[in-house]
Amino acid sequence: MSHIGVAFDKARAEGRAVLVGCMPAGFPTVEGSIAAMTAMVEAGVDVIEVEIPYSDPVMDGPVIQRASDIALAGGVRVADTLRIIEAVAATGVPVVTMTYWNPVEQYGVDAFARDLAAAGGTGLITPDLIPDEAQEWLAASDAHGLDRTFLVAPSSTDTRLEMTVEHCRGFVYATALMGVTGARTQASAAAPVLVSRVRGVTDLPVGVGLGTGTGAQASTVAGFADGVIVGSALIRCLLDAPSLPAGLTALRALSAELAAGVRTPAH
């Protein structure tokens, strides 16, 4: 079983959901992002999702875009991302990477898979890659023992959903809201329906992303999903802070609140 699968199994045995916290690599700096992700782990985040900053992040909301722009302006490269992954993986939590496909193609698909595995990464979430066009990635992830997470949405047809899920390993990423990511005031009513559709075709855990920003929302999502994925709300802790130390304090507090939320699922 994959490292991330173990995290989901452990959470299930404890009657709770997994908390996945996302942060772009190199935001606010390379060392700053390592400090931020380490703080999240110390506050109770179960899995870290490291996003590779990209200049045209079509599915990311304004908060993640702004953080990615800061990282890119600082000159962050894929090699830096791998160093960050290695540092965070050393804490013992699973580290999954989210990336648009272009940076992987530019790096070389097999070389990227090899280097990601060597850094201790567990796998990839690929928002703009569909299994039908992923032959090279399917082969590379098999060769290097990496998980692969494709996205399903409320708009996915049954055929598309089944085919997508069939090619996932580790967990399935269910996007709870249509459109770009970002903290919302309420969880999408479509999310529980989507999760039950996914569970109808696979035993893989289902993580729900897009919109969670408070402990209460995390508790709600934990009531119907195996994983609660949070990005924008955590990133905003750093964006809105006057300094990195102040940002890390806010980040720890929100991470702890979210961690408490996933441990008290609302049924």
UniProtKB/Swiss-Prot annotation:
Active-site residues per Swiss-Prot or TrEMBL entry: 49, 60
Gene3D superfamilies in alphabetical order: Aldolase class I (3.20.20.70)
One Pfam family cited in the UniProt record for this chain: Trp_syntA
Entry GO terms, CC: cytosol
Segments forming a coiled coil: none
Catalytic reactions on record: (1S,2R)-1-C-(indol-3-yl)glycerol 3-phosphate + L-serine = D-glyceraldehyde 3-phosphate + L-tryptophan + H2O
Family annotation (SUPFAM superfamilies): Ribulose-phoshate binding barrel
Enzyme class per UniProt: lyase
Family: Belongs to the TrpA family.
Function according to Swiss-Prot or TrEMBL: The alpha subunit is responsible for the aldol cleavage of indoleglycerol phosphate to indole and glyceraldehyde 3-phosphate.
Protein name, as recorded: Tryptophan synthase alpha chain
Organism: Salinispora arenicola (strain CNS-205)
Source lineage: Bacteria, Bacillati, Actinomycetota, Actinomycetes, Micromonosporales
Name of the gene encoding the protein in the UniProt record: trpA
